[in-house]
A protein has these predicted regions:
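Amphipathic alpha-helical dimer-interface segment in Rossmann-like NAD(P)H-dependent oxidoreductases
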Residues: 1-10
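C-terminal helical subdomain
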Residues: 54-57, 61-69, 80-135
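Short, hinge-like loop/turn segments at secondary-structure boundaries
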Residues: 35, 76-81
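A short local structural element in Rossmann-fold oxidoreductases
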Residues: 71-74
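Catalytic loop of short-chain dehydrogenase/reductase
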Residues: 9, 15-41, 46, 50-54, ...
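Short amphipathic alpha-helical segments, especially helix-boundary/capping motifs
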Residues: 19-24, 79-85
């Protein structure tokens, strides 16, 4: 933000999308530092909006509330072998996983919003309330 906001301010437009996790909205035991960091991102976005929205800069806070079906997230958590095994048996469209392509579509949509109806906070999650590992 420190580098980008002056550039966008000079241009008179721009979008800053900030990603965080479930911990930005609600805490969980043994995750004190993580919750503080994610909550800080949320407050940073609200503060940046207060300062820069009138200057044509859109800031949105995106909470990715669930496990993304990607090797660099789910794969690291489970290990490569188990990750591949689950993808083969459960499939890409399993209810409890968020597809990276769907996240990308949401980010693109936010970047294209008209300033008369900007979204400043979005919560992304799979339509299933029960994660696949709890079913």
């Amino acid at each position: 933000a420190k580098v980008l906001m002056p550039i966008m301010e000079e241009r008179g437009s721009g979008t800053l999308l900030v990603t965080s996790a479930t911990a930005a909205m609600r805490g969980n035991k043994n995750q004190h530092s993580h919750a503080a960091a994610m909550g800080g991102r949320r407050m940073l976005c609200q503060t940046l909006n207060a300062e820069f929205a009138s200057k044509g800069i859109h800031v949105a806070h995106i909470v990715v509330d669930g496990m993304v079906d990607a090797p660099d997230t789910l794969g690291k958590m489970l290990g490569e072998e188990l990750f591949q095994q689950l993808r083969e048996t459960k499939g890409m469209e399993h209810d409890g996983l968020i597809l990276p392509e769907s996240v990308a579509e949401t980010y693109y949509y936010l970047s294209q919003q008209h300033r008369s109806a900007w979204s400043h906070e979005v919560d992304i999650r799979a339509f299933s309330d029960t994660a696949w590992w709890n079913s």
